[in-house]
Amino acid sequence: MDELMAKAKGIVLDVEHSATKDGPGIRTVVFLKGCPLRCIWCHNPESWSFRPETVDDTVHGGKKTYGKERTVADVLEEVLRDKPFYDASGGGLTLSGGEPLAQVRFASALLRAAKDAGVHTAVETCGHLPRTVIEDVRPNVDLWLYDIKGMDGELHRKHTGVDNALIHANLRYLDEQGAKIVLRCPMIPKLNDSDENLAKLAALADALKGVFRIDIEPYSPFGVDKGQQLGLAVYEAPLPPPEYAEGIIRRLSALTRKKVAKGDL
């Protein structure tokens, strides 16, 4: 890794070690701050802003800061401490957020450095990015965890703040380039779980040869308290029972040739 890459800086929200639900094997997940979407059900609203934010810690008292400026070299050193676990389990590094590729200079440098160190890489993305960003990082990404939050463009705009045309265009581009893709689909009761949405989602997945699994992520109210701390309005609804996700998986599995599994929002 050259000196310029090593010194590239980004705003890191958190680093999770020993993760098992964000790609294969045991993984280290680096969460970057900043996102172009404003999903009303977001469980990480503290990831929206690109700047560190300090709030009152209503659980432990005092203050809590979301986000810290770090260099690629610093984060890579932390990631590589877990390399024996990656090697033993087929794991690696996952970038998440927020939208990790919105900090493209930092994300690109970290992904390239991880690949140079022999680490498997995955990126969770909303896909609402300039094509040039996708093109820049694609050679250093082994697996894409691609968020599909709804198939209807107008409803997508209502629920996330943006249309889904660019998201779908970038997804098709990645598929054309031979990318390995898992579709990650939050399911929010009465908002995006209609028969029509599931049918269109199944058709999309079946049309993309690189998609090998669809993960269903049922609604969680995890972001409500964090949103209140930050003065942000986050959609609040009851936690759906376990059979809700099971029902979505059954309905979608009947419509698609791809594997459908339960993920976690």
Language model segments and positions:
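Auxiliary Fe-S-binding modules of radical SAM enzymes
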Residues: M1-P24, P189-L265
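N-terminal [4Fe-4S]-dependent radical SAM core
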Residues: M1-R70, R81-S89
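Short glycine-enriched, charge-decorated loop/helix-capping segments at active-site entrances
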Residues: W48, K64, R157-D163, L230-P238
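Residue-level detector of family-conserved "landmark" positions at structurally sensitive sites
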Residues: S49-P52, E124, R184, I216, ...
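A general alpha-helical scaffold signature found inside nucleotide-binding enzyme cores
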Residues: R70, V162-A169, E243, G247
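Conserved AdoMet/S-adenosylmethionine-binding subsite of the radical SAM
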Residues: L76, L80-Q229
